[in-house]
Amino acid sequence: EAGVVTEELEDCILNVAISPGIVSVSVHPYYNGGIAHALFYGLTCRKHIEKHHLHGEVVSYGTLVNLMVDQNMEKLKLAYDFNKEVGLPTCLADLELEKDDPLEDVLRITMENQELTHTPYPVDAKMIHEAILKLEDYRG
């Protein structure tokens, strides 16, 4: 807010950037992402998303979808409000997609991903698509 880069800020940024990388190479790939990461791989089959949006940006949207699938409205509100506040995606338009896009290619690739091998409950393309559509109408 003050426009000053402090040592504490640098430490925080390094922790945020490095910790997920350490975790991702320390656990079996089956336990490393769930819906948010599977959807990242699906969404990036659209070349404009892969070209114009960062990994964390797309995964942050996938996290919202994951929370909607989980029907965890309390955590969804927290994550949604955070995304809004810092300018991360909260809807398809933020990823340059239309609400009426059937996302068939996105959902197919999402479902083929190993990230969905071990989930706490069975996940299918219909669940993810319905969560995406519900997220389109969600306003926190």
Roles of regions detected by a PLM:
Residues 1-82:
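Active-site segments that bind and position negatively charged phosphate/pyrophosphate groups
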Residues 72-140:
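C-terminal charged capping/lid subdomain of soluble metabolic enzymes
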